[in-house]
Structure formats: C-alpha cells, structure tokens
C-alpha cells in the first residue's frame, strides 16, 4: 500500500540521469495513498525491498531539469524538497504554510494574498524587488504580487537556499522555489478532495488526469477555498479576514517525433478577501487588540500564468525553450491608519502583463568523460500600470481646517480690534466687540479636503546570458564554475498630484481656494551585473555522501518607489499653505525639482556574496539523511522596506548601506520500526546585522550599526513524526497518526530594534484513515492556541507613533476526504 512509501524529503545522491523517466516510481509517489495507476495498488515492497531505508524524492518523483546536470544533493548547495505525500501530511496549501517546515526560509502569513514577503538567510523585502525566485513548471513567476498563490495538485516542491543567480538571474539572491505539477503521462485517474473545518473553513478540489495515447496526455484541475476568518473587526462588527478564492489549471503534454516534446500550461486563480486585520499593539504588555479599522481592508486579484515548453533530446545536447505570458489585475483598499477614526485610506490597482522567453542547452554526455555543461539565454518584458491614490479623511482634514479657521478668525478679530482701539476703545472692549461683530455676520468656517491621486507606469526589461560547467576532476572531486551576465532596464512615467481644497465661509461669504502640486515626469535607469559561482564537491562514499564548498554572488535589481510621491507632495502642500489663502495656487516645479524627485524615488541594486560550507550525509545504509550547512553573506546596498516619510503613507525601499548575515542550517530525516515511523527535524539560525546604516540627516540622524535586520527570525525550527499502523481489516487498511511543530523567533519589527516577537512554537496533529479508495484525514493546527504576532508595523497618521500587529491564527480543526477513481 502507498502509505508504506514514506519518503524523506532531503535529496540524496544517486546515479540515475536527471532526465530519466522513471514512470513506475513517479506513479507510486504521486498517487493517492489507496490508489494505483489504472486501479492497481502499489506496495512499498514492490518498489523497494528494504523498508528501513530513506529514499530521495529524486528517486521517486522524477522531473525534467533543463539546467542542472546533477541531482540536488549532489550539488554544492543547501536545499529541501517535499513530495505531494509530504505536502498532504503537513496540510499546507500555499508557500506561507510550506515555509514553516524549511530552515531559514520564512514567508509570514499576514495581510492578504498581496503580501508576499520572503526572507532567506537575512535577505528579503516587503515591497518592490523580491529576494526569492519562484518557478512553476519551469516558468518564472514575474509578478511579486502573484507569489502568494493557492498551491494544489503538485507532485514536488524544491526550495534552494542561497544565491541562484548564475542559472536563474536577478531576484534569486536569497534562493529559489520550484513547483512541479503532476505528470499525466505517469499518473491517471480522477482525484476529488472535500474539506471542512472550524471558522467555516471549506475546500474543494477536483482533478482529472488522462493519458490519451503514448503521445498525448492532459490534466485538468480546479479548486475552491474559503473561510469566514479568525478575527472580527471590533469597530464594524464584520469579519476582518474572510476569504474566497477559486481557480483552475490545464496541462497538455505531447510527445512528437524526432525527440520533440511540447507542454502547454495555463493556471488561473481569483481571490476575493478581507485583509490587513491589524490591531493596536501594546509594547508594554505585548498584547495585540482585535482589528478596529474604519472599514475592512479589501483585496481582489485575477492572475493567469500560461506557458509553452518545447524540449528536444538530441544525441549531443538537450534543448529547452520556455515561453510564457502572465497577467495580473488586482484591487486593494486599505485603511492606512488601522484606527476607528477615519484618517486616511489607500487604493492600489495594478495591471501587469509579462512576457518571458528562455533558451537552454545542456550537454547530453560528459565531454571527454569529465566536462558537463549548460548554457542559455533569458529575456523578459514587463508592463506594469499602478493606480495608487491616497485619500485623507475627516480625522486628518478636520484638525487642519480647524487650525486654518482659528488662524483666520484670530487675524480678523485682531484687525477689527486694532481699528477700534485706534478710535479710543479699550483693548478688552475692542476684542469683545470684534468677536460679536464677526459672529453676528455669520462667523468664520473652514472645510478642508485633501487627496493624492497618482498613476504610474513602470515597465522593465531584463536580458541574461549564462553558462555553467561541472568538471569531474577525479572519481571523488567535482568543480562547478558558472557565470551570468544580467542586464536590466527600468523606467517610470509618473502622473502624480496632491491637492488641498479649502472652502471658507467668512461672515456669510463663501470662497473656495485650491492648492495643488502636480508632478508629471519620466526617468529611467539600467543596471548591469556579472554573477559568478564557484563550487567544489567531494564525494565521501558510494552511498552518495559528500561535502561541498561554494562561493556565489547574489543580486536584486534597483528601481523606483512609487510610495514616495504622496509624502513628497504632501510636504510641498504644507510648505505652500499660506499661498492658497489668497486664491488658487499651483506649486511650480523646475527641472532641478524633477531631478531631485527622480533621485528621491530611486533605489540602487542590492549585491551580496555568499560563502558556504556543507555536507549531505547518507548514514546507516541510508536509514538516516543529514544535511548540514554553514554560511556567511556580505550584503552591499541592502534594500530595506521602511515607512515613507513623516506620516507613513506607505512602504518604500531604501538602501541601508552594508550588512552581513551568518548562520547554519540542519536537516535530519529518517525512518524507524521497519518504515512505520517517518520523522524529520529542521533547524536554521541566522544572525543578520547592519554594518553601515544611517537614517536621516544632521541632529536627527540615527545610526543602526550592529542592529538586527528587521523581519528576519533568528531561529527557525520544525519537526514532524508520523506513525503508521497497518490493519488486516478489509475496510480499514491503515491508520497514520502524526504530529508536527514549527517555531521561529526572535524577530525584530523595525531597524531600531525597538519592538519584536519572541520565539514561539505552534503544534499541530493529524489522523489519517486509509479506506482504500477513500482517505479520511482529521487535522488540527495550533493545538495550544499559542498567541503570537506574524507581522507588526508603526505609523504616525495621528501625529504620534502608533504600533499595530497581526496575530497568528488561533486553534483550528477540520476533516478532509480524498477520493480517487
């Protein structure tokens, strides 16, 4: 039975070719636990004779790798992999949940599906350029806004830590995630999943896999996922994080003559949710209140990832072409102050179209018996239009209007009183008389309205050429040399403005004056980078154990902060407020002003060097796998997400001088009791600190040297254990009892390290009953109802700094039913 195939997720060395189509084993892994290809059950004994061994996913789930010439644990890198079976056991549905079981890899669960921050080894950001690349069936996901997807019907997920720029280019400085769909040539039938749980969690999936003939196969899948949410807005009374999402995907694989294969992929998803359930954080007690914003945040997204993959296996080399078109259209509305009082809100609407093309050539056989090579070229073009107005509401505009009204009233009273005093009236009497005269005439009133609309076009072009060679210097020693040339052209056309409309009522007479500041400009920049890689691997034994050392360069592209415009323009309005008291006034801008604006909104590329030592050990006749690595990274021009300006209208990217990070990663996986107990333990430690970083100027400058880089957990820990009990019952084939725990912290929330989240742990469990064609899974998460924050932020919308946080999800339980026929 399939439950006896318990696979360790770390990848051991073996000697099958990377492109081998080991269909029988791939079928066995991908299958529903009680199912088999064409209805025939597959037992572990029919696949591997020794049930005490831990086997690699590379041995079970074989996927085509157009670039690498070695399996993951034969390479000089730190990695983790999970099969569909392990993903099911952990109950994960997206990369946020998956990251809880990967050392030094964190994608916090907060905000909405728009939130896609990933932090690896001290590298990461909340906005703009991502630190990690994501590939879906060899297609690079181009929009960071599309990273946070619902993942389903996958056969395998690989997570590579450390810079992967040589083969995968910019924005893979922290690492790379590769996701693979099930292959309909290897796996057939129909899968149905039904799930329901507390908080009205609901999930439905259906997928059909059909091998039409020896040359054509296809799969068609769809899903719906939703829940009422965990948090209720204490001000509005509605759910602050309810969500509904749905989607479908199609994969058609065709094997043509002359060694050509054609794959067509389309993956569409739609999400509609309430988001950003941030409550006030009390730094003294560490308690986080329920959300209490003026209205519930909203996020909606349409996302399409489509691609065409052509491959040809030749006698001398393999050729791969991957083309893709990607589309993202979303809508986000957020209460930017997170308070019941209506200070300000931000609307963001993105429309992005992307095209990518990549050609890869990989040597079929070692040249001279020792030289393995890969070379290729990559091109992408992105068009992004962002509509991002900021609205300032009554809680902010009323005090401004009152202040102006008070100034006008006092000036009028004083002017009238001075004339009366000049005519001989006592000062006190003159003041009182002037006040009565103004009030009798209708008084003085002032209404202020403010806004900051903005439309931004930010196209990007990227071109890369790469080569990597692997030399077998001896039967034990291998040398890897790689180099990539990367070129980036980025530009921005901004049409941004801010206005302050002042409607004055002065002694019965009304007048409206408008103060405007408008910016309409263009600028562009380009960046070039060489991304080298040098690695050595020493094979220790015939079981695939090895040690390695690698030096590689990472790179994140520079760009422009559209979040800065609201603060720039608001500062100009405040400076020119008096000019609008005499009539409409438009703030003028010179060429020098535009040059300063262009400099203010730009940020530089981030560059890092990674030095790493590690080992992949297969111990006790492959009964235990140990992966261990130690790394040191030097980062220059570190990109850091901070609040924009004095008021905190949004996030912007700044370059934080220099930083460094160091740490270790360890993964243990094994089996006991003749394969009935499957377990794993992962641990990661990261110490990421600033070496040079000063914020502000003059007396207000702050020095953050030796402060910890924010949002990076210092420790990540996870462990799982699953015990299978076989039965002789015809109805119940087996029971699997499992438990898991994940922990992380300490995490600082700002560059000053003034507030943080301590180390916390979350416990989960599941019970799976294998009934043959049906699998019933009972599950629970956060069994101890641990209180912790997944995210925290501060702003000064009220004029004083306020702190807010999102709490982690509390206890939840449910049941899933899986059918295969």
Summary of predicted features, one role per range:
Residues 232-238, 276-292, 335-344, 391-453, ...:
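Solvent-exposed loop segments that connect transmembrane elements
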Residues 189-191, 196-227, 231, 235-273, ...:
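Transmembrane beta-barrel wall of Gram-negative outer-membrane proteins
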């Amino acid at each position: 039975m399939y439950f006896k195939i318990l696979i360790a997720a770390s990848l051991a060395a073996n000697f099958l070719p990377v492109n081998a189509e080991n269909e029988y084993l791939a079928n066995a892994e991908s299958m529903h636990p009680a199912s088999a290809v064409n209805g025939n059950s597959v037992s572990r004994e029919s696949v591997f004779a020794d049930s005490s061994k831990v086997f690699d996913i590379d041995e079970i789930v074989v996927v085509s790798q157009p670039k690498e010439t070695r399996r993951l644990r034969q390479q000089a890198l730190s990695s983790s992999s999970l099969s569909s079976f392990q993903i099911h056991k952990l109950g994960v549905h997206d990369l946020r949940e998956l990251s809880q079981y990967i050392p030094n890899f964190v994608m916090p669960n907060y905000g909405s599906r728009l939130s896609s921050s990933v932090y690896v080894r001290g590298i990461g950001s909340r906005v703009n350029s991502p630190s990690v690349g994501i590939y879906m069936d060899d297609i690079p996901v181009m929009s960071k806004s599309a990273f946070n997807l619902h993942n389903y019907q996958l056969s395998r997920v690989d997570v590579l830590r450390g810079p992967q720029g040589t083969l995968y280019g910019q924005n893979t400085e922290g690492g790379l995630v590769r996701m693979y769909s099930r292959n309909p040539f290897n796996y057939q039938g129909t899968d149905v999943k039904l799930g329901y749980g507390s908080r009205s969690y609901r999930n439905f999936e259906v997928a059909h896999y059909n091998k039409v003939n020896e040359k054509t196969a296809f799969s068609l899948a769809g899903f719906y996922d939703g829940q009422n949410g965990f948090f209720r807005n204490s001000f509005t009374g509605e759910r602050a994080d309810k969500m509904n999402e749905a989607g479908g995907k199609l994969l058609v694989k065709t094997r043509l003559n002359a060694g050509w294969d054609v794959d067509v992929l389309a993956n569409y998803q739609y999400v509609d949710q309430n988001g950003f359930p941030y409550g006030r954080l009390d730094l003294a007690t560490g308690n986080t209140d329920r959300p209490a914003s003026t209205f519930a945040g909203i996020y909606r997204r349409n996302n399409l990832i489509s691609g065409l993959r052509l491959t040809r296996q030749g006698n001398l080399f393999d050729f791969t072409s991957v083309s893709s078109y990607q589309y993202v259209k979303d809508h986000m509305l957020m209460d930017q102050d997170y308070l019941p009082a209506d200070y300000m809100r931000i609307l963001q609407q993105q429309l992005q179209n992307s095209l990518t093309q990549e050609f890869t050539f990989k040597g079929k056989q070692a040249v001279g018996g020792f030289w393995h090579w890969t070379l290729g070229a990559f091109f992408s073009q992105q068009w992004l239009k962002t509509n991002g107005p900021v609205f300032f509401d009554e809680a902010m505009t009323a005090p401004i209007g009152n202040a102006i009204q008070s100034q006008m009233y006092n000036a009028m009273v004083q002017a009238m009183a001075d004339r009366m005093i000049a005519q001989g009236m006592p000062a006190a009497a003159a003041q009182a008389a002037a006040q009565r005269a103004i009030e009798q005439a209708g008084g003085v009133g002032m209404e202020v309205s403010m806004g900051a609309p903005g439309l931004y076009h930010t196209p990007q072009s990227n071109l890369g050429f790469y080569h990597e060679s692997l030399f077998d210097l001896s039967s034990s020693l291998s040398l890897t040399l790689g180099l990539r040339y990367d070129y980036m052209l980025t530009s921005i056309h901004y049409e941004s403005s801010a206005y302050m409309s002042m409607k004055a009522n002065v002694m019965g007479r009304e007048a409206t004056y408008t103060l405007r500041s408008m910016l309409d400009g263009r600028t562009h920049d380009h960046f070039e980078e060489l991304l080298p890689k040098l690695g050595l691997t020493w094979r220790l034994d015939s079981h695939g154990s090895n040690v390695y050392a690698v030096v590689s360069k990472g790179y994140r592209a520079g760009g422009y902060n559209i979040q800065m415009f609201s603060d720039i323009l608001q500062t100009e309005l405040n400076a020119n407020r008096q000019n609008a008291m005499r009539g409409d006034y438009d703030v003028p801008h010179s060429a020098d002003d535009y040059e300063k604006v262009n400099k203010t909104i730009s940020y530089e590329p981030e560059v890092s060097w990674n030095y790493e030592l590690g080992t992949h050990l297969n111990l006790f006749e492959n009964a235990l796998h140990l992966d261990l690595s130690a790394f040191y990274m030097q980062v220059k021009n570190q990109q850091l997400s901070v609040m924009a300006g004095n008021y905190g209208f949004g996030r912007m990217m700044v370059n934080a001088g220099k930083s460094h990070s160091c740490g270790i990663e360890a993964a243990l996986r094994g089996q006991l009791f003749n394969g009935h107990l499957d377990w794993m333990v992962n641990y990661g430690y990261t110490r990421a600190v600033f070496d040079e970083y000063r914020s502000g100027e003059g007396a207000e400058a702050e020095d953050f040297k030796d402060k910890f880089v924010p949002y990076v957990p210092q420790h990540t820990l996870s462990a799982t254990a699953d015990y299978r009990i076989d039965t002789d019952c015809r109805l119940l084939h087996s029971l699997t009892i499992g438990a898991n725990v994940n922990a992380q912290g300490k995490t600082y929330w700002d560059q000053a390290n003034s507030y943080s989240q301590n180390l916390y742990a979350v416990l989960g469990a599941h019970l799976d009953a294998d009934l043959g064609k049906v699998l019933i899974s009972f599950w629970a998460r956060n069994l101890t109802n641990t209180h912790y924050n997944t995210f925290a932020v501060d702003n000064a919308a009220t004029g004083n700094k306020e702190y807010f946080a999102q709490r982690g999800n509390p206890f939840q339980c449910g049941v899933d039913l899986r059918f295969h026929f």
